[in-house]
């Protein structure tokens, strides 16, 4: 059985039907046992314990001092609170603290106990900080990474959709943060969270795989090719087009592998294997710095080399390569 990709959590209950139940949402926001997932300018709150791995700092409402009853409607309307779903029968909300220059003080400097992290996690020294989820590179538990990714993605969407794309009037958050509506009575356009589809593919030629290098990559890193799906294009056509545009390689058979949400800022990565029907590479220097064929056995023996790197462990790119190497 194939494990889900990182940033996915099948066990997480989104409870979508609850989003329109205003009284239920309000009751959960008055429940001290409900949980908030703080986000500050697209960074997530994490707790680091000396000698252990970082943990997501999901805090109970009680731990952050609660939310005043007369502030709930305003915070929901502005999209500063977003209902994420239910975990272990407790409602979880993304909490935007981006307006604060001192976010940890805004959260009343959460302690080890408040964050629910046991001292047995590996050390007596703790650090609470806001961090870029990408830099944690899959070190969080899978379920925690998925929760933080969802909170980050939803609040990013709200921050970019304060105004109506149809008429320019301000928008207001509804359905517990899962829709924004234009406030102009003549418009009232509804806006929903968007996810931009992108294909990501490992192109193979027998025992060889095609990997490319973007000039922004860290030294020595090569990865799979990828690109956005264009309007009116099938996923398979997008795979073939992107590979041709970036490397001049033609592909034939295309096989779906899996997908991965990638909230950096708002993508869904659709993973494929593609079989090459040509082998001569011509790199589009506007897209890539380099592209080359790598033998499977060579990759197996150089995965941990200091001079050569594969993509991060939390990425579907690494999953595509890893599964191919395991064959």
Feature map (PLM): residue ranges:
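Acidic pyrophosphate-coordinating catalytic loop
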Residues: 260-267
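Acidic, metal-coordinating catalytic segment for phosphate/diphosphate chemistry
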Residues: 148, 153-156, 160-200
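Short acidic-glycine loop/turn motifs at beta-strand connectors
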Residues: 86-89, 205-207, 278
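N-terminal strand-loop-strand
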Residues: 180-223, 250
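Conserved hydrophobic/aromatic beta-strand scaffold that supports enzyme active sites
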Residues: 83, 163, 181, 200-202, ...
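Non-heme Fe(II)/2-oxoglutarate
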Residues: 268-291
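Nudix hydrolase/Nudix homology domain
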Residues: 1-79, 83-161, 172, 218-222, ...
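The catalytic Nudix box helix
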Residues: 224-258, 272, 278-280
